[in-house]
Design a protein with these regions (language model features):
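Eukaryote-biased recognition of intrinsically disordered, low-complexity regulatory segments
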Residues: 1-11
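ABC nucleotide-binding domain "signature motif"
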Residues: 6, 52, 201
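Short glycine-rich loop/turn motifs that provide flexible caps or phosphate-binding loops at active sites
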Residues: 9, 17, 44, 169-171, ...
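N-terminal cofactor/phosphate-binding cores enriched in small/glycine residues
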Residues: 14-67
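Fe-S ferredoxin-like electron-transfer domains
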Residues: 48-49, 57-185, 194, 199-203
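Internal gly/pro-rich beta-alpha loop/helix module
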Residues: 188
Length: 204
């Protein structure tokens, strides 16, 4: 496969011509914040947190192919501002606190918040007191907590290749994942649980 040379944050990187900026960065140990990326899934660009700056223009790195001589900045004043807006919207709609969450620690949302330097005081201000949404524990293999879900759709896209037992119901801020309980076609592979980047899906 043809190779191209580009620079990411000043570091010269050689990548396959068919790869994306995100993949090139990921393969070279360069962190770009993300919530909806999983290595064996087609990039969806849903979270948009992986935005970078290319020659002064902001692009979504998981959907933008590399080019010869490309100059990429994973952080810039504009990228940081837009990324902070996106993550603060997520935090504001993320009902649950991190304390006591079984997903705390490896949580991709926590990692991104730390990268953008959103501290606990800011989190408390962003999260208004909301009525907790009921957990879905109808599936015999795992529980789904919509209060922790960031709608990355990794579970949906993973299951599409196996049983298509997951869907999205509702729109906008009322959207949530649906697993259909005992009537589901779920085969208990639990790939959705393993791949959840937050604590929304937990094995029973």
């Amino acid at each position: 496969m043809d190779k191209v040379t580009l620079k990411i944050d000043g570091l010269e990187v050689v990548a396959d011509k068919e790869t994306t900026i995100f993949q090139a960065a990921h393969h070279n140990g360069i962190y770009i914040p993300h919530l909806c990326f999983y290595p064996d899934l087609m990039a969806s660009g849903i979270c948009r947190l992986c935005m970078v700056e290319v020659d002064g223009k902001v692009v979504i790195s998981c959907r933008t192919p590399v080019e010869q001589g490309m100059g990429v900045r994973t952080r810039s004043p504009e990228v940081d501002k837009l990324r902070r807006i996106l993550i603060e919207i997520l935090v504001a709609n993320h009902h649950s606190t991190c304390r006591g969450c079984p997903g705390s620690g490896p949580c991709a949302l926590q990692k991104t918040m730390g990268y953008i330097c959103i501290d606990r005081g800011r989190v408390r201000k962003l999260r208004p007191t909301k009525e907790e949404l009921p957990e879905d524990n109808l599936n015999p293999f795992f529980n789904y907590d919509p209060n922790k879900c960031v709608l990355c759709k990794i579970c949906l896209h993973t299951c599409e290749r196996i049983q298509s037992a997951i869907n999205v119901v509702g729109r906008g801020c009322n959207a949530k994942m649906a697993f259909f309980g005992d009537s589901s076609k779920c085969e208990s592979c639990k790939e959705c649980v393993v791949r959840c980047p937050v604590g929304a899906l937990m094995e029973t």
